[in-house]
């Protein structure tokens, strides 16, 4: 059965074999920054949060997790680059495994979407460019709760890039040490890898800029390095070719997306082993009329983008972005996605899978509590339809 044909017998609640992982359903916890890891170290609150959202055979992706001390752009986001962090993550992973779930760690470097307060010695954030994120729409959240404009970044020298690639590789190894089932490379949403991919940001004239192939080079090196470190079956990749978050615009999102897919397919062929999945965020033009930076779009443009990437990719395809139950069911039944990840709905509904199955009423999420440090309110206190049990 091809992706284009779909399978009307498959639903969000059908089992799925994602490489070496036997999943009991297609509903995935999307990676979401929550700012509860005080001083970058996971704690019992994170273990409770992820355990609440675990189902037997379910698949979870952790929040964006720092690969180095200077890779953060939010307060109190977890890291995976120190022994202390690795040990602290073990309680989170063990809580998920105790419920019968699988969990990948999302490896994250925000690049220019940072501030001196998050940088060692108060330095400038790094990027593909020295152009700052525009101040007309975007602000960076500081530890004191204030929002200020993004500073001018420092463009990485080509000679520095291998060290950044190594940060991803070491973090991947650390994630496996912590017990994670694998990792997801965050190449989306205007963060460091996306700052190389998008021609609206990347103004380099060396081997990392200009052509699409050059702009894909950094992602290619990260994927190659991480696959070499932990194996392809434990590696997922997330991209968002048509998402304009943090000024991450591209003149031809479809061609960029297809170039990334082609590069990943080629790597899989050379390696002889498939990646765990490709995770693509779609723009939802039909829901919002435009992407975050104001670029207009249409249903047809969105459908062409997602279907083209789905058909081109040789492996498990995961979609995210504004899905409800009905849209998720449609995506699976029509063959547009193997898996669907949910974000905000999962924040407010830790038992989202159960609610979807019985068409239960959904809790409303509270945006004001998305990025606080409270270990309970807006984090682990959303009600269940039935009492929660960790076992």
From Swiss-Prot:
InterPro entries: Aldolase_TIM, OxRdtase_FMN_N, Oye-like. It is found in: Peroxisome. Expressed in green seedling, leaves, flowers (anthers, pistil, petal and stamen), and to a lower extent in roots and siliques. Specifically expressed in filament during anther dehiscence initiation. GO terms for biological process: jasmonic acid biosynthetic process; oxylipin biosynthetic process; response to fungus; response to ozone; stamen development. It is an enzyme of class 1 (oxidoreductase). Disruption phenotype: Male sterility. Fertility can be restored by exogenous jasmonate but not by 12-oxophytodienoic acid. Large petals with altered vein patterning. The active site is at 191 (proton donor). Keywords: Acetylation, Fatty acid biosynthesis, Fatty acid metabolism, Flavoprotein, FMN, Lipid biosynthesis, Lipid metabolism, NADP, Oxidoreductase, Oxylipin biosynthesis, Peroxisome. GO terms for molecular function: 12-oxophytodienoate reductase activity; FMN binding. The modification N-acetylmethionine is found at residue 1. Optimum pH is 7-8. Active from pH 5.0 to 8.5. Induction: Induction mediated by wounding and methyl JA (MeJA) needs COI1. Seems to not be influenced by salicylic acid, cold and heat treatments. Induced by infection with the fungal pathogens Botritys cinerea and Alternaria brassicicola, insect feeding with Spodoptera littoralis, and wounding. It catalyses: (1S,2S)-OPC-8 + NADP(+) = (9S,13S,15Z)-12-oxophyto-10,15-dienoate + NADPH + H(+). A motif (Microbody targeting signal) lies at residues 389-391. Its main location: other. One of its GO terms (cellular component) is peroxisome. It holds the Pfam family Oxidored_FMN. Substrate binds at residues 186, 284. Its cofactor is FMN. Specifically cleaves olefinic bonds in cyclic enones. Involved in the biosynthesis of jasmonic acid (JA) and perhaps in biosynthesis or metabolism of other oxylipin signaling moleclules. Required for the spatial and temporal regulation of JA levels during dehiscence of anthers, promoting the stomium degeneration program. In vitro, reduces 9S,13S-12-oxophytodienoic acid (9S,13S-OPDA) and 9R,13R-OPDA to 9S,13S-OPC-8:0 and 9R,13R-OPC-8:0, respectively. Can detoxify the explosive 2,4,6-trinitrotoluene (TNT) in vitro by catalyzing its nitroreduction to form hydroxylamino-dinitrotoluene (HADNT). Belongs to the NADH:flavin oxidoreductase/NADH oxidase family. This is 12-oxophytodienoate reductase 3. It comes from Arabidopsis thaliana (Mouse-ear cress). The gene is OPR3.
């Amino acid at each position: 059965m091809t992706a284009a044909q779909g399978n009307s017998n498959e639903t969000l609640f059908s089992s799925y074999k994602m490489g070496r992982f036997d999943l009991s359903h297609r509903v995935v916890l999307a990676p979401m920054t929550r700012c509860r890891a005080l001083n970058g170290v996971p704690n019992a609150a994170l273990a409770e949060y992820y355990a609440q959202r675990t189902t037997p055979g379910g698949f979870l992706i952790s929040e964006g997790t720092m690969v180095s001390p200077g890779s953060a752009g939010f307060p109190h986001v977890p890291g995976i680059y120190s022994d202390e962090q690795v040990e602290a993550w073990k309680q989170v992973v063990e809580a998920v495994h105790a419920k019968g779930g699988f969990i990948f760690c999302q490896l994250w470097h925000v690049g220019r979407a940072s501030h001196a307060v998050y940088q060692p010695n108060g330095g400038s954030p790094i990027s593909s460019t020295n152009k700052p994120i525009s101040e007309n729409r975007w602000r960076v959240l500081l530890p004191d709760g204030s929002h200020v404009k993004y500073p001018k970044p420092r463009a990485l020298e080509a000679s520095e890039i291998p060290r950044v690639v190594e940060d991803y590789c070491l973090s991947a190894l650390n994630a496996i040490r912590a017990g994670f089932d694998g990792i997801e490379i965050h190449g989306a949403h205007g963060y460091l890898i996306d700052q190389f991919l998008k021609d609206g940001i990347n103004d380099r004239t060396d081997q990392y800029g200009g052509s699409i192939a050059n702009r894909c080079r950094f992602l290619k090196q990260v994927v190659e390095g991480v696959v070499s470190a932990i194996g392809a079956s434990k590696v997922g990749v997330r991209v968002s070719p048509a998402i304009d978050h943090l000024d991450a615009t591209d003149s031809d999102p479809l061609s960029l997306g297809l170039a990334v897919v082609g590069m990943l397919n080629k790597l899989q062929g050379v390696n002889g082993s498939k990646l765990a999945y490709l995770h693509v965020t779609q723009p939802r033009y039909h829901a919002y009329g435009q992407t975050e930076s104001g670029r207009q779009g249409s249903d047809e443009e969105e459908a062409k983008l997602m279907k083209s990437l789905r058909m081109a990719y040789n492996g498990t395809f995961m979609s995210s972005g504004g899905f409800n139950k009905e849209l998720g069911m449609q995506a699976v039944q029509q063959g547009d996605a193997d898996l669907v990840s949910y974000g905000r709905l999962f924040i407010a509904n830790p038992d989202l899978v159960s609610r979807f199955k019985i068409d239960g009423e959904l809790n409303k999420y509270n945006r004001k509590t998305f990025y606080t440090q409270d270990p309970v309110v807006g984090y682990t206190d959303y009600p269940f339809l039935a009492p929660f049990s960790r076992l």
